[in-house]
């Protein structure tokens, strides 16, 4: 949820860190809120199946999808390959909007056994 809000080029930050000039760099952040929902494999955090086809990624339009436990199957399709499969990050004017965006887009992604927490960012909304 941090990198999507970073407006200063990450390379500039890395170079300033290496040069010892990070304190002089004006690091800028977007005012948008960000919420990330992790899509996990069925059985996670215990044992889970790998190699299950993942569908619906092309339908995600209003969120960023970060791959974690994914791989390309023998037939060239995207498949599950870990417990924490994908992170779906929604951005919005506030946390409520970012949360709504993340969950709406996460629902478009399909794979057998997919599950996720439904309470992400709820403490921040109280």
Positions of the model-derived regions?
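Generic C-terminus detector
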Residues: 73-75, 79-126
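RNase H-like, Mg2+-dependent phosphodiesterase core
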Residues: 54-69, 88, 96, 102
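Hydrophobic side chains in beta-strands
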Residues: 39-40, 67, 90, 122
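Short, surface-exposed, polar/charged, turn-prone segments marking secondary-structure boundaries
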Residues: 17-19, 62-67, 93-95, 116-117
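Beta-strand->loop->alpha-helix junctions that form or flank phosphate-binding loops
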Residues: 4, 55, 64-71, 112-115, ...
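Active-site "cap" helix and flanking loop/linker of ATP-utilizing ligase/carboxylase catalytic domains
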Residues: 1-62, 73
